Curated annotation (Swiss-Prot):
It is found in: Cytoplasm. Responsible for the release of ribosomes from messenger RNA at the termination of protein biosynthesis. May increase the efficiency of translation by recycling ribosomes from one round of translation to another. GO terms for cellular component: cytoplasm. It comes from Amoebophilus asiaticus (strain 5a2). Belongs to the RRF family. Keywords: Cytoplasm, Protein biosynthesis. The gene is frr. GO terms for biological process: translational termination. Its main location: cytoplasm. SUPFAM superfamilies: Ribosome recycling factor, RRF. This is Ribosome-recycling factor. One of its GO terms (molecular function) is ribosomal large subunit binding.
Length: 186
């Protein structure tokens, strides 16, 4: 049935979005080396609007442990520094009037374990999201069966849906494995 295929395609797209969201959340978990995307969640008040940091400054990494933030306008430096201090990243910015420098401290063993736990929580959220999508689509299949779709057709569709679910959960597991390795790398 055409409607069943539409639902399977829809579920695949939604599950892919859940995987992408999980990957974005993983990128926010710092892994001991300086990366510009560590600061993606930080916004500052810029001309009376909350603006992402990467839209008001150039963020570079001159070496593995240093981030340099060069704002387009000098007047933003104090605001940038304050936003970084107030973020939950545990970073200490240093302002020299021209740029804001952040030395990323090496991670302690305890902090690494906390970050792995945080990554596992994000992975679990992604898996739950995928399972909820599966549940919603299965409900749609039940309604289609009541509307006249054959039981065999619905069973085959549910098998395909389960395969999609397994594929995307496996994808999240792979992302988690890579993130754990990145975090635990000394």
């Amino acid at each position: 049935m055409d409607e069943i295929q539409k639902q399977l395609d829809k579920s695949d797209q939604l599950m892919q979005k859940a995987c992408t969201h999980t990957q974005i959340e993983f990128s926010k978990i710092r892994a001991g080396r300086a990366m510009p995307d560590m600061l993606d969640g930080i916004s500052i008040l810029y001309y009376n609007a909350m603006t992402p940091l990467n839209q008001v400054a150039a963020i570079t990494t001159p070496d593995a442990r240093t981030l340099v933030i060069k704002p387009w306008e000098r007047k933003c430096i104090q605001e940038i520094e304050k936003a970084i201090v107030n973020s939950k990243l545990g970073l200490n910015p240093q302002n020299d009037g021209e740029v804001v420098r952040i030395i990323v401290p090496p991670l302690t063993e305890e902090r690494r374990k906390d970050l792995v736990k945080q990554a596992k929580n994000e992975a679990e959220k992604g898996k739950i999201s995928i399972r909820n999508i599966r549940k919603d689509i299965k409900e749609t299949f039940k309604h289609l069966q009541k509307d006249g779709a054959s039981e065999d057709t619905i069973k085959r569709a549910e098998e395909k849906l389960q395969n999609l679910t397994d594929k995307h959960i496996h994808n999240i597991d792979n992302l988690l494995t890579h993130k754990e390795a990145e975090i635990l790398e000394v």
